[in-house]
């Protein structure tokens, strides 16, 4: 028995970063397992994540999941919630495991800050922001968010798919390293994000 992460956040209010870390680590373990079997979820959002009574978290609703090698794009029948879709999903392009990573990054962002990275008056306006905007850094909203955890979140949410984590396992490794040392400064991510900013017009 349990409730969705969406319900949990609504009841709990603002989540502590440590709890957010606990949840996202379990989410990425689930995605890493699915991706290792060639399965992409395509609709990662708090409504599809279950928080069980024992504090464990399960990724649910693989109803629109597809095999990674299937030539699938975003269709009318397979739309993820617009607040969590990746830029490539918004463009209707071919997607892979990195699209799930982007959506998981949005979920982490929402847990850390208590708000979504992009809001708008319509689904189209939100989708456009995923394509062209950079969200506020979590620490600009919540000063207690550790810099290393913020960097993990922002790398997962890179609009450029090639700047994102290459796999759920890679993101999970950084999360596990951070869990061991919350003072860890993931400098290599900072450099990658800086390079991205320098190359953007």
Predicted segments, located by residue:
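AlphaC helix of the protein kinase catalytic domain
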Residues: 4-15
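Activation segment signature within eukaryotic-like protein kinase domains
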Residues: 23-24
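Protein kinase catalytic-loop region centered on the HRD/HxD motif
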Residues: 29-39
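C-terminal lobe helix-coil module of Hanks-type protein kinase domains
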Residues: 50, 81-188
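Activation-loop N-terminal segment of eukaryotic-like protein kinases
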Residues: 51-55
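Regulatory activation segment
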Residues: 57, 70-79
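Regulatory extensions appended to serine/threonine kinase catalytic cores
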Residues: 185-201
């Amino acid at each position: 028995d349990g409730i969705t992460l969406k319900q949990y956040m609504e009841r709990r209010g603002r989540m502590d970063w440590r709890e957010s870390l606990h949840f996202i680590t379990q989410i990425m373990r689930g995605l890493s397992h699915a991706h290792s079997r060639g399965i992409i979820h395509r609709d990662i959002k708090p409504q599809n994540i279950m928080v069980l009574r024992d504090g464990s978290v399960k990724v649910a609703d693989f109803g629109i999941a597809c095999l990674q090698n299937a030539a699938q794009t975003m269709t009318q029948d397979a739309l993820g919630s617009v607040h969590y879709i990746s830029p490539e999903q918004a463009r209707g392009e071919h997607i892979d495991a990195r699209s799930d990573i982007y959506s998981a990054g949005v979920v982490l962002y929402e847990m850390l800050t208590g708000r979504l990275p992009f809001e708008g008056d319509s689904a189209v306006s939100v989708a456009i922001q995923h394509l062209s905007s950079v969200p506020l850094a979590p620490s600009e909203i919540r000063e207690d968010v550790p810099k290393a955890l913020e960097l993990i979140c922002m790398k997962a949410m890179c609009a450029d798919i090639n700047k994102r984590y290459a796999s759920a396992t890679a993101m999970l490794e950084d999360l596990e390293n951070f869990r061991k040392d919350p003072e860890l400064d993931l400098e290599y991510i900072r450099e990658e994000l800086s390079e991205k900013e320098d190359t953007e017009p």
